[in-house]
Design a protein with these regions (language model features):
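N-terminal cap/lid segment of alpha/beta-hydrolase-fold proteins
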Residues: 27-59
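Short beta-strand element of the alpha/beta-hydrolase
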Residues: 61-70
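Short amphipathic alpha-helix adjacent to the substrate-entry channel of hydrolases
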Residues: 77-94
Length: 272
């Protein structure tokens, strides 16, 4: 669905109202930070494989958003978007190791390990294990799609993403082989490949529900809209019946996350 100027004006008005609401709602949130979610055999793992939890004290049966930051798999830092701290949702901000220091498979495994931690611990914060959403922007969106579609990553931790994840919500994520991996292989940035490190390699009809969001096709990064449009088409051709796709007009790769947060919250609110 392409969100035109009229839709975007409405979203921006909602965004302004949301900022006011978040300021009030965020005051009710408690924080648990610097939680090590994975065994730390070295100082780098101990530094990077940590997560933060934002939650409302006393809540029960709350939806849980596991959030993966962007940064090209080579940078960025874990955080919890202010816009997601509302309506009682529990938000988990995940850090992970970068491909400059470890293999891409290890980075993806970090993402899977963090989700395993959530399943093992989030109930004590009031989270509902049947309402766990995986979301992320850019590189974070890529990680969401990889662990949601290549079942081997979460199966290692006893989790079936098709049955146990409420929905996958990648924002402007790479769906071909990630450019950071292609760079390590000596492949040019604008030369696309699809291999075992491409979410497209794993498209299937029985995956978890998906909310796929892209920025404006005219200002997105490296044809990212077209990548995601093809991704959605291939999911549907493979029989997936629960894929929602948005393009947000006027927003580039960097700033599309703000309206995407609103779309995710609305999506969660509409789930049964």
């Amino acid at each position: 669905m392409k969100l035109n100027d009229r839709h975007m004006k409405r979203i921006l008005l909602i965004a302004f109202a949301l900022m006011v609401a978040v300021a009030a709602s965020a005051k009710n949130y408690k924080w648990d930070t610097e939680i090590l979610y994975k065994g730390a055999p070295d100082a780098y793992t101990e530094k990077m494989c940590r997560l933060d939890v934002a939650y409302e004290e006393g809540g029960q049966d709350r939806p849980v958003i596991v959030w993966f930051h962007g940064g090209g798999l080579t940078g960025g830092w874990r955080h919890i978007p202010d816009a997601l701290r509302r309506d009682g949702a529990i938000v988990v901000g995940v850090g992970y190791r970068f491909v400059t220091n470890v293999s891409l498979a290890e980075t993806i495994d970090d993402a899977a390990a963090s989700v395993a931690w959530v399943f093992q611990n989030i109930e004590k914060y009031g989270g509902d294990l049947s309402k766990i959403y995986l979301a992320g922007h850019s590189a974070g969106g890529y990680l969401v799609s990889m662990i949601g579609l290549n079942k081997a990553y979460l199966a290692k931790y006893g989790i079936d993403p098709d049955k146990q994840i409420k929905a996958l919500a990648p924002y402007s994520g790479q769906v071909i082989t990630h450019f950071a991996q292609r760079e390590k292989q000596g492949i040019a940035n604008l030369t696309p490949t699809i291999d075992e490190f491409a979410p497209l390699f794993y498209v299937r009809g029985d995956a978890a529900p998906m909310l796929v969001i892209s920025g404006d096709r005219e200002v997105e990064l490296f044809g990212r809209y077209e990548e995601n449009a093809y991704f959605v088409r291939m999911l549907r051709l493979n029989g997936h019946k629960n894929v929602t796709f948005y393009e947000v007009d006027g927003f580039d790769h960097g700033d599309m996350a703000e309206p995407a947060h609103l779309l995710l919250l609305k999506y969660i609110k509409n789930q049964k």
